[in-house]
């Protein structure tokens, strides 16, 4: 089997809440997502999706996905899509960096492998380690009381895990954490995610001020070294995200005891092949993970569900149902949240089928 063509569609994903705010005044109102098809000479097509969180979260941006596909796409024509390690080594050899560009090609090839073998992707990633996956809800940055009201609403929908978007004014962030923790049950989980928005001094102060609360601190500062400094000064459980972008940074962080949990975003590390490797390293080292992506719709959510379902429950800290945040359905067969959980399809591959009437005409055609 050989890859014969690649297509990509641009699709807007408006938000039910209207706007998503995070640290340093960043926000998105309509996410720009790219749906990718990898076509083969066997008549089997695999699908994937990549949706960066704006252009200020990681070294990635929405237009870059499609520009990158124009660059790397012709160089994977003729490769066997089921030889996933060979494919990934080739992509790394012809385009340095840009893992988010390579991710949808890799994921679409996992979809192909599942369709060829007649197995769901979670079986290929290790099997059904858990039947349903616990979800968290991200709470867009607003005034403390407004965030607390949103948590109360989502708690009524079945969520028990919440990621609070902080990384603004330090005093307000302390209030955000305190006010929201007060309305949660003792068994509920609260993560204060600064998305690199604090200085080291601010992070140290905030961690000390909320030291009496049951709260996780996530990615307080921009650099690994700053985060490591804050980690050494707090007893609060610690999550790293933005600075864990591959096997190398993961291994260093494990050696340095830099975190208790990592946030494993599939497109950030280059797709399912590399995410599976990092997942397995985390399991072997006893490190739980939030398994998710930067953003997306139905196809991203399906991809998350397959990796999370194949991860042992004790190492699956949480995952994300991004398709419940938006107003547009782009694929049939995607996971749907039930009482704060989701699961992956048992159909071959990712178990989804794009809704082409929504996608329209492709904006990238290669091959």
From Swiss-Prot:
Mg(2+) binds at residues 193, 218, 241. Catalyzes the dehydration of cis-3-hydroxy-L-proline (c3LHyp) to Delta(1)-pyrroline-2-carboxylate (Pyr2C). May be involved in a degradation pathway that converts c3LHyp to L-proline, which would allow S.novella to grow on c3LHyp as a sole carbon source. It comes from Ancylobacter novellus (strain ATCC 8093 / DSM 506 / JCM 20403 / CCM 1077 / IAM 12100 / NBRC 12443 / NCIMB 10456). NCBIfam families: HProlDhtase. InterPro entries: Cis-3-h-L-Pro_dehydratase (IPR034620), DgoD-like (IPR034593), Enolase-like_C_sf (IPR036849), Enolase-like_N (IPR029017), Enolase_C-like (IPR029065), HProlDhtase (IPR054855), Mandelate_racemase_C (IPR013342), Mandelate_racemase_N_dom (IPR013341). Its EC number is 4.2.1.171. GO terms for molecular function: hydro-lyase activity; metal ion binding. Binds 1 Mg(2+) ion per subunit. This is Cis-3-hydroxy-L-proline dehydratase. It comes from the Bacteria.
